[in-house]
Regions:
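Basic- and hydrophobic-enriched, low-structure N-terminal and domain-boundary segments
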Residues: 1-156, 160-163, 506-507, 606-611
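P-loop NTPase motor domains
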Residues: 28-32, 144-444, 528-549, 562-611
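A broad, low-specificity signal for short, low-complexity segments enriched in glycine/proline
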Residues: 107-114, 128-140, 160-161, 326-332, ...
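Conserved ATP-driven motor cores of ASCE-family P-loop NTPases powering translocation/secretion/packaging/pilus
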Residues: 436-438, 445-539
Length: 611
């Protein structure tokens, strides 16, 4: 509690001093009127005081005939008022019991005000802490942005205590990353019962997956830049460091190739795909110094059909600024990166688009993105997908909010939660720091799950990491061994004030002892104490609140936990089928056992009946 001692105002004491001055002067004059008493029987003159009390009304209250003695007596009254004014010389500010810090653990009752009255409309943090997902259902003072940073190492129950309980809530659309590829099977039934559309993008096996064709979401030159930025930023894995020369060259060439396919697709009425970028890269080099390469001829043809187009301008800019060995190096980088599209299965999942990203925040949708745990070769594709997700959904939300959407109104806009498990494996998402600052107003939130703060810093740099963390309304700590992370959370916990008692004793001829009480400051949680919380415990740091220490959420206590699957052999295991081509779907519907394999000879022997 803050206690502030302020300097007293002079004017009231000045008026008091004048009043006492006159009162003392007037009483002295009344004293002079009192008859003398016997000095033997009334040594202290109390008889005169008794007479004065009995004759207060005999003397006029107005007496301005001052004598030297009455002035002196009056000044003594004024001096009393002056001493009263000076009696407080300490004008400091005090916080009794909080001299070294006011940190303490939050209580369950204190966090109750952040909950929604409807349990299904809450986000689940720990066993006893939840927060309403929709700010319009909470009072203004209890509204916190819904971005969350989750710290948790391997085996710290990130999926079981954080991801699964919130999926079971079924209160929004979801985008969830999964490095094992089983979360959709374990939670799918609960989502189907809630009426969700299911989408799956598998970068682990490239099988049984929906398709993602980024060209479906390119509508103008700015979109070309966004796609090129997403790919080149992911290739530059430490994008906050190093020579900017190479990223600049990469971006120019990337804009040129993607732009060519975009404009050529519009002119010839087809939907391009990233695999065709690989085909163009193979034709970049000249076979003879004097003979133009196939790609050069393609750009010349595009310029004839669409003069001054953006792709041709970027191509000219690239050729004018980079030549010789530099150009060859850029070609080599692109050839290496895009060689992943030589895999037939990968080309299949980027040929057509069935994800329908623009519908995710207006139709209840659950999206599962399977990303490899250790292989970074496809990070540029997952980063590109997330770049498209944020761009498309922000545009959809803006259209709905501004009343420009053809079929939906503001009441139809759904909240969308992105649960990004193993956030560092996604790759660098372009412009994430500003994106995370603005998605709140679009009913979008991101939950970033990392093992340490350094995982974010590697991708985005220290300053951008600060921006990302500052835009998180909550930090949920499940466990970590990273010292920087532990120090940060210890500092965030704050310092508390403790009573300290020192006792000393000396022995000998002049034995003595003393006891001294004092107050000291101490971290509420030291880095060691943060690191050694119980395996079933969690720490929750809500914005502007004290840290809350609680048990991790027990998944079995969720009302809909019975819908979860424990393995392929139980009835809750969700199975799905996606077809990457019409032939695959036809084969699956017909059944391999019903397919008759015949050769050309057998076909020639089939009699043809002509009517």
């Amino acid at each position: 509690m803050i206690t502030e001692k302020k300097k007293r105002r002079l004017r009231p004491y000045l008026l008091l001093g004048l009043g006492l001055f006159y009162l003392f002067h007037w009483l002295f004059k009344l004293w002079l009127l009192a008859p003398d008493t016997d000095s033997v029987t009334d040594v202290f003159g109390l008889g005169k005081l008794n007479w004065m009390s009995d004759h207060l009304g005999d003397k006029s209250w107005f007496d301005f005939q001052f004598t030297p003695t009455s002035l002196l007596i009056g000044m003594s009254g004024f001096l009393i008022a002056f001493l009263l004014y000076l009696r407080v010389t300490d004008t400091g500010t005090y916080r009794y019991g909080e001299e070294h810090g006011s940190a303490r653990f939050a209580t369950k009752e204190e966090l109750m005000r952040f909950r929604d009255e409807d349990p299904e409309k809450n986000m689940i943090f720990t066993q006893n802490s939840q927060m309403g997902l929709f700010n319009n259902r909470l009072s203004f003072e209890n509204q916190i942005n819904k971005n969350i940073l989750v710290y948790g190492g391997t085996g710290d129950s990130k999926t079981r205590s954080a991801v699964k309980p919130n999926i079971l809530q079924g209160n929004s659309s979801f985008v969830t990353t999964d490095t094992k590829g089983i979360l959709i099977h374990e939670t799918g039934k609960s989502l189907i019962e809630k009426g969700y559309k299911m989408k799956i993008f598998d970068l682990i096996t490239f099988l049984n997956s929906d398709g993602f064709n980024v060209f479906r979401y390119i509508h103008n030159e700015m979109d070309i830049d966004r796609v090129a930025e997403a790919i080149t930023e992911s290739l530059n894995r430490n994008g906050h460091e190093g020579d900017p020369f190479w990223p600049a060259a990469n971006k120019l060439l990337m804009r040129s190739l993607i732009g060519y396919l975009y404009f050529d697709g519009k002119l010839d009425h087809y939907l391009p795909n990233l695999g065709q970028v690989t085909d163009m890269i193979r034709e970049l080099r000249r076979n003879h110094p004097e003979a133009e390469s196939p790609v050069e001829l393609m750009f010349e043809d595009l310029e004839r059909r669409s003069p001054g187009n953006y792709a041709s301008r970027q191509w000219d800019l690239f050729n004018k600024n980079f030549d010789g060995q530099t150009r060859a190096s850029v070609y080599a980088i692109f050839a290496t990166t895009f060689s992943v599209f030589d895999h037939e299965q990968l080309r299949k999942i980027i040929e057509k688009d069935t994800l329908e990203i623009e519908k995710w925040n207006i139709e209840k949708t659950a999206v599962f993105i399977h990303i490899p745990e250790v292989d970074p070769a496809y990070q540029f594709l997952s980063a590109l997908l997330f770049s498209a997700i944020f761009d498309v959904l922000i545009k959809t939300a803006d259209a709905v909010i501004l009343g420009e959407h053809p079929t939906k109104t503001k009441e139809d806009l759904l909240h969308l939660q992105v649960w990004a498990d193993e956030f560092g494996q996604i790759g660098k998402i372009p412009n994430l720091p500003p994106i995370i600052s603005v998605i709140r107003s679009r009913e979008i939130s991101i939950k970033m799950m990392v093992q340490s703060q350094s995982q974010i810093e590697v991708l985005y740099g220290k300053e951008n990491t600060k921006t990302i963390i500052n835009n998180c309304g909550a930090i949920l700590y499940l466990g970590s061994n990273d010292l920087d992370t532990l120090k940060y959370l210890s500092e965030r916990s704050g310092k508390q004030t403790l009573n300290d008692q020192n006792y000393s004793e000396s022995r000998g001829r002049n034995a003595s002892s003393s006891k001294q009480n004092s107050k000291i400051g101490r971290e509420l949680l030291t880095p060691h104490e943060v690191a050694t919380i119980g395996t079933t415990e969690a720490l929750l740091f809500l914005s502007k609140q004290n840290v809350f220490r609680d048990q991790k959420f027990n998944l079995d206590t969720h009302p809909r936990a019975y819908l979860l699957s424990n393995g392929p052999n139980d009835d809750n295991w969700y199975r799905y089928k996606r077809y990457l081509s019409d032939i695959d779907e036809w084969k699956d519907q017909v059944g391999e056992e019903n397919v008759i394999h015949i050769g050309i000879k057998e076909v020639e022997e089939v009699p043809l009946k002509v009517s």
